[in-house]
Amino acid sequence: MTQLTHINAAGEAHMVDVSAKADTVREARAEAFVEMHATTLAMIIEGSHHKGDVFATARIAGIQAAKKTWELIPLCHPLLLTKVEVQLEAQPEHNRVRIESCCRLTGKTGVEMEALTAASVAALTIYDMCKAVQKDMIIGPIRLLAKSGGKSGDFKVNP
């Protein structure tokens, strides 16, 4: 069975020591969804929201969140990210927004949490900007799509 890396022999949480690991190129992609009424989504698509461009704001929020993941999640390392990309896609056929994030660096630890945080905070930002119009939006699912680099190897979700 695989061991939990953030738990020591005494069962205590600790930050993993990555100092002996080799620097490798690491990348992770994650996605999140925000379901909403067709009228709320139309307001976003048409750009008629009184707070401004919802997608631009969510994109910037996701990028900022990826860079601050280590401040939000206690055992994450501060990372020198070399790429953070957040793409937002309106999906009117499903009354939702799909968010996909991608994070990359050359370093000793992976960027899965940064990608997940970027997608999550972008979704939360959409909710925040639109809650005056609709409070029952649904955020989720949020998941890791893929990761590459590092000792544990590559991962890609099955389509």
Swiss-Prot record:
The keyword Lyase applies. It catalyses: (8S)-3',8-cyclo-7,8-dihydroguanosine 5'-triphosphate = cyclic pyranopterin phosphate + diphosphate. InterPro entries: MoaC, MoaC_bact/euk, MoaC_sf, MoCo_biosynth_MoaA/MoaC, Mopterin_CF_biosynth-C_dom. GO terms for biological process: Mo-molybdopterin cofactor biosynthetic process. It comes from the Bacteria. Its EC number is 4.6.1.17. It is an enzyme of class 4 (lyase). The active site is at residue 128. GO terms for molecular function: cyclic pyranopterin monophosphate synthase activity. It holds the Pfam family MoaC. Keywords: Lyase, Molybdenum cofactor biosynthesis. Substrate binds at residues 75-77, 113-114. Pathway: Cofactor biosynthesis; molybdopterin biosynthesis. PANTHER family: MOLYBDOPTERIN COFACTOR SYNTHESIS PROTEIN A. Catalyzes the conversion of (8S)-3',8-cyclo-7,8-dihydroguanosine 5'-triphosphate to cyclic pyranopterin monophosphate (cPMP). HAMAP family: MoaC_B. Belongs to the MoaC family. Homohexamer; trimer of dimers. This is Cyclic pyranopterin monophosphate synthase. It comes from Yersinia enterocolitica serotype O:8 / biotype 1B (strain NCTC 13174 / 8081). The gene is moaC.
